[in-house]
Amino acid sequence: MGPSVAVVGAGPWGTAIACHLAERAHARPSVALIVRTREAADALRRERRNDRYLPGVALPDALAIDDDPARAASAGIVFAATPVKALEDVAAKLARAGVRAPLVWLSKGR
């Protein structure tokens, strides 16, 4: 079974949002953080930290980490926390992966 919430983008904003959602014990959402590369996914799973973008913050055990956009295909909602310039590329990758859930773009700049 896939996540109920997927967050695409493991920069500071995406990591913080994914951690926040995964820590909501009362809601118990299943949250997946989708990253660009297998190497990044492996490192985040192994270290349970994203010190490059969010130093000193542990990733919750409940947070799944994957590099495959198809992991988001079963999500009820997808948050994309990437730069605006990546919007077209990320949306196309998600569509090719079969993602049909509402997509909320969390961009705060270019």
Q: What is the predicted function of each stretch?
A:
Residues 1-54, 64-67:
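NAD(P)+-binding Rossmann beta1-loop-alpha1 motif at the extreme N-terminus of oxidoreductases
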Residues 59, 65-110:
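Rossmann-like NAD(P)(H) cofactor-binding subdomain of soluble oxidoreductases
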